[in-house]
Amino acid sequence: MNCDRICELPDSLLTQVLSYLPTIDSVKTSVLSKRWEFLWLRVPVLDLKVSDFPDENYASFIDNFLEFNRKSRMRKFKLKYDEYTYDDDRLAGWVVTTVDRGIQHLDAKGFETNMCVREFMPQNIYKCNTLVSLMLVTVGIENPEFVVSLPSLKIMHLEDVWYYDDPLIMEKIISGCPVLEDFVLIRPIDFCNLDVLQFLRVRSLSLRSFRLTFEYSVSCTYFSVEIDAPRLEYLNFNDDQSDTIVVKNMTSLSMIDIDSEFNVKFGGSRLEPGDLRKRDIIRDFLTAISCVRHMIISRRTLEVLDRYSKLVPIPKFDNLYRLQAAVSRSMLQLLLVFLESCPNLENLILDFTVSTEPEQDGLTYVPQCLLSSLECVEIRELIMGEETGEKLVRYFLKNSVVLKKLILRLEDSSIANQDSDIFKELSTFTKRSRSCEVIIIH
């Protein structure tokens, strides 16, 4: 589209186009012509990084923009601070103004100038009928003094956010979000021994996607998490600190990404035969997610399940058709034990790590899925010539009855021209499924 065609467009359409640009780029269009000089000021979006401004000119820029649009509704307000500039006094005021003007998308990213200082958001964010998405990073939120009402909020992302006054503040907020679908919560590291959601309760009838990250705590505080979301389809669970984990009503769960030690090793007690409480927590968690169809599981989670499986059997995952697991040479027997709990598995992806740990005993046991359902295996980060990796390849070729495809992703790109030698070596391996195709990817 040439310049003449663009100039024929109405102002309403041009401002809509400019709304997809960062404000600093939208301003640059003011030099195009007299018509464009103030057009950017009518864009209902303010998207800024303070690093784009010299000194503290960004503050007066925002004030002037909001003053010019005093009678206009705001669609989006996005402000990102950096380590050199952080205005503790103005952010909350700007949020008040934009919320009062019917903001739909609010994105505020603070910065830690002092590890134990946060600017707290105004309470009018709890009574915003128009807010659709809310992202808060490195700020604070207070206990609402009234019933939360966010009837339009569908997306909420809270990262490194401090919470004062009430350990159940998150339950109050979520209860006021009747259409919330996507929730990300990354708990802050409590260097200052402040409350960082000791009791996290996520109860929602609308939630479809939830990502929880809580990796590290320096205090000896007791933490617990409860998730009750019958419509949840995706769960990313990365929590190493909670002593109590309750997950229930996961009947809609389709995909889960687990990276957790269940407080078994780091910062917690080891899983011993007499530790019935911790064992039951793991059992109830696995049982609650047993309807899942697609699972990604980390190496350290598998290591915890190795201990668990020596005490009681791992629950069955009858619906699981796709599994991605991180394994090393010392975990191959554990992998087979876990695969036995996946009787209908069709696709298996292994992120293989060559470690210095001793290799476990030979691969002799054959899980049910290899005999009846497993159609595709992908092994990543393989090093040709490495003994354990080759054993793994031999094992799947020898024991997979209905295998259609074996994909080998090689780590060493220096052997890219040696495919013929690799295929020649693979041709000596016993192949249970005659229709199996071996694919090598560098």
Swiss-Prot record:
Recorded source organism is Arabidopsis thaliana
Which keywords, in A-to-Z order, does the entry hold? Leucine-rich repeat, Repeat
Q: What is this protein called?
A: F-box/FBD/LRR-repeat protein At2g26030
Domain FBD, by residue range, is 358-410
> Which SUPFAM superfamilies does this chain map to?
F-box domain (SSF81383), RNI-like (SSF52047)
InterPro entries, per database record:
F-box-like_dom_sf, F-box_AtFBL13-like, F-box_dom, FBD, FBL13/AtMIF1-like, LRR_dom_sf, LRR_FXL15/At3g58940/PEG3-like
Taxonomic classification: Eukaryota, Viridiplantae, Streptophyta, Embryophyta, Tracheophyta
Give the coiled coil ranges.
Answer: none
Q: Where is the F-box domain?
A: 3-49
The stretches annotated as LRR repeats are: 128-160, 162-187, 188-214, 234-260, 278-309, 324-352
Q: Can you list the disulfide-bonded cysteine pairs?
A: none
- Which Pfam family, any one of them, does this sequence belong to? F-box
- PROSITE patterns (UniProt xref): FBOX (PS50181)
